[in-house]
A protein has these predicted regions:
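N-terminal secretory targeting modules
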Residues: 1-21
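Membrane-embedded segments
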Residues: 21, 26-122
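Short loop/turn segments at strand-loop or loop-helix junctions that form parts
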Residues: 28, 83-88, 241-246, 282-285
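Well-ordered, non-membrane alpha-helical segments in soluble/globular domains
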Residues: 64-67, 218-226, 257-268
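Secreted/periplasmic serine-hydrolase-like ester/acetyl group-modifying domain
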Residues: 85, 101-235
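Active-site segments of SGNH/GDSL-like serine hydrolases
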Residues: 229-256
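C-terminal regions of proteins
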Residues: 251-316
Length: 316
């Protein structure tokens, strides 16, 4: 699958629209892209026979709302909806990319809430949405990416992948039938070369991780999240999922990222207990049983690490 010609949110929204034979559907960000029932190292095998991975880069609560509405309308065979909790999940507007399908979001939100409730929520967050739109328009990375696409003579397209070794990758990243991703051979090699002692890195890019120091969660976002879970529970069994960060990220517990993970994991378990939802995994790699060599970078675990997630299972 070559880059740029398709917006991945369109791809995964369409995957959600077509009924599959999967008994589990997983919602999350790039941290879950390696979760798979199609590989040798299967993930969530005790909970799922076959899963559909709807992991999207930079996925936020707004993405979950859009995809969940499509799931409710189209997925009849699934039994479990597994929602990945990130350090930024219980906030609104932590990434601008969901605005790609803002119209779908507005429709989904109206279906979730009564008219009076929806008017209140819409008024509360409209201003920040407009700010995000403006920021996205002037974002230098977005601008450069768009410019390169316009000037490129390459034939960016989606094509069927030939047989290849999943461990080594192939010329481009590959979307597997279950929605999980195999990185390109070039990316896999780069990751092997770039592995470093992350404990030496004292300052982390909080913006890239969707974390705002001190703002671990928002009341309004949590209310929307709870409403979403209750809506899904009418048709499915809902499970929360937490994936670990690299052990070296945890070496300095005064980092805002560590404080965020501790507070959010605590809040996620608190919400899960109230809603009678089970929780799989943890931000802490020691609890899951993951080692440094089982990570691709600071926040993305390999399929080997992710195959251990059910080592931490909290029933509610």
């Amino acid at each position: 699958m070559k880059n740029y010609v398709w917006n991945e949110r369109d791809i995964y929204l369409n995957l959600a629209k077509y009924e599959s034979d999967s008994d589990c559907i997983v919602l999350g960000s790039s941290q879950i892209k390696q979760i798979s029932s199609y590989r040798k190292k299967r993930s969530l095998s005790s909970s799922c026979n076959q899963l559909l991975n709807l992991g999207i880069n930079g996925a936020v609560l707004e993405d979950y709302i859009v995809l969940s509405q499509s799931i409710l309308e189209n997925q009849k065979k699934a039994k479990n909806i597994i929602i990945a909790i990130n350090a930024w999940t219980f906030n609104l507007n932590r990434d601008a990319r969901w605005l790609h399908y803002k119209d779908d979001y507005d429709i989904a939100l109206k279906k979730m809430f009564s008219e009076n409730d929806n008017n209140y929520i819409t008024n509360e967050i409209t201003a920040s949405y407009q700010t995000l739109l403006i920021k996205n328009l002037i974002n230098i990375k977005y601008f450069i990416s768009s410019l390169n696409l316009i000037n490129s003579k390459k034939n960016y397209s989606i094509e069927m992948a030939k047989d290849f070794n999943f461990e080594l990758g192939t010329t481009h990243k590959v979307l597997l039938p279950d929605g999980s991703i195999i990185s390109s051979a070039e990316t896999i090699e780069e990751r092997k070369k770039n592995k470093k002692d992350l404990s030496k890195k004292r300052e982390w890019n909080m913006q890239n991780w969707g974390i705002v120091p001190g703002v671990w969660y928002e009341k309004n976002a949590i209310n929307i999240f709870i409403k979403l879970v209750n809506q899904l529970k009418k048709n499915f069994n809902v499970i929360f999922l937490i994936t670990p960060y690299h052990p070296d990220v945890w070496s300095n517990e005064e980092q805002p990222s560590i404080k965020a993970m501790k507070n959010v994991e605590l809040k996620a378990n608190e919400i899960a207990k109230i809603l009678n939802v089970d929780v799989i995994g943890s931000f802490n790699p020691e609890k899951v049983g993951c080692y440094s060599n089982e990570f691709m970078d600071e926040i993305h675990a390999t399929d080997l690490c992710l195959s251990k997630l059910e080592n931490v299972y909290v029933s509610n």
